[in-house]
From Swiss-Prot:
Protein name as annotated: Small ribosomal subunit protein uS14
Matching Gene3D superfamilies: 1.10.287.1480
Keyword check for Metal-binding: no
Description of how the protein assembles with itself and partners: Part of the 30S ribosomal subunit. Contacts proteins S3 and S10.
Entry keyword set: Ribonucleoprotein, Ribosomal protein, RNA-binding, rRNA-binding
Disulphide connectivity of cysteines: none
Organism: Pasteurella multocida (strain Pm70)
Family the UniProt entry places it in: Belongs to the universal ribosomal protein uS14 family.
Gene designation: rpsN
Pfam family, one: Ribosomal_S14
Upper taxonomic lineage: Bacteria, Pseudomonadati, Pseudomonadota, Gammaproteobacteria, Pasteurellales
Length: 101
């Protein structure tokens, strides 16, 4: 089990990313615009740097919903590989069965 503080930190990062999404996209648009003046682009870079670090989507981590495990998380289920296997063996995931060939 992950510490509660680690889970809370990831929740905070998700909220910050949603809050600053529009502003971040607007600044990135200015930075990538070749027709914008160098001064405008430089100011956009400086403004982007002043935004909170945790508002960047790349700082988010997919975690297991049950355990908070950060590695081996299957996006389709939102669970770690271990919990997916346990749930599949109990028959709790419809349509999922053990491979056999």
């Amino acid at each position: 089990m992950a510490k509660q503080s680690m889970k809370a930190r990831d929740v905070k990062r998700v909220k910050l990313a949603e809050k600053f999404y529009a502003k971040r996209a607007e600044l990135k648009q200015i930075i990538s615009d070749v027709n914008a003046s160098d001064e405008d682009r430089w100011n956009a870079v400086l403004k982007l740097q002043t935004l909170p670090r945790d508002s960047s989507p790349s700082r988010q981590r997919n975690r297991c919903r049950q355990t908070g495990r950060p590695h081996g998380v299957l996006r389709k289920f939102g669970l770690s590989r271990i919990k997916v296997r346990e749930a599949a063996m109990r028959g709790e995931i419809p349509g999922l069965k053990k491979a056999s060939w």
